[in-house]
A protein has these predicted regions:
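A short, polar/charged loop-to-alpha-helix boundary motif
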Residues: 67-77
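Zinc-dependent deaminase
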Residues: 1-39, 103-173
Length: 173
């Protein structure tokens, strides 16, 4: 689908800038939320992701499938690539991925393969989520790595953002 001539949907949401003093799960999820707003403003599905290691954000991305015409350009995949470059290794031991929606099968597999310590997501996805939603790749007994999972961090604002985007998108199409 050609998206170059389509008008982008105005985003009615504002970015949130939490205090830098407390760098907890909510702090990092707000960063991912702000990236999801950036995605919306670029007419992409509003999903954002950041990767934290040692209290610092080493990667930050949002969906870019339409802009890049690449079906793998999900926020999580892009952030994993950035993080691997930042640390100089594909193993992201000790790092945490924060993402505004539960990862799909592709992204869930990539998070496991990258050896992240944790994944924190806001909105569960019972249709395509693979870290506890539709299925749970993390619970495969034969896997040689398992993630710590935290669900529902800032679920309400992230869900409101996704719902509003798709409601406006359907109305515009």
């Amino acid at each position: 689908m050609n998206t170059e001539n389509r008008p982008s949907l105005p985003c009615p949401f504002d970015k949130v800038h939490p205090s830098q003093l407390v760098r907890d799960d909510e702090f990092y999820m707000w960063q991912a939320y702000n990236l999801a707003i950036d995605a919306w403003r670029q007419d992409e599905v509003p999903i954002g992701a950041v990767i934290e290691l040692g209290g610092e954000i080493i990667a930050a991305a949002h969906n870019q499938r339409d802009r890049t015409r690449d079906p793998t350009a999900h926020a999580e995949i892009l952030a994993l690539g950035q993080a691997s470059s930042a640390v100089g290794d594909w193993r992201l031991t000790g790092a945490t991925l924060y993402v505004t929606k539960e990862p799909c099968p592709m992204c869930s597999g990539a998070t496991l393969m990258s050896r992240l310590k944790r994944v924190v997501y806001a909105v569960p996805d019972p249709k395509m989520g693979c870290l506890g939603g539709a299925t749970d790749l993390n619970s495969l007994p034969q896997s040689n790595h398992h993630l710590e999972i935290a669900r529902g961090v800032l679920e309400k604002p992230c869900l409101e953002l996704l719902r509003a985007y798709f409601q406006l998108k359907r109305a515009a199409d």
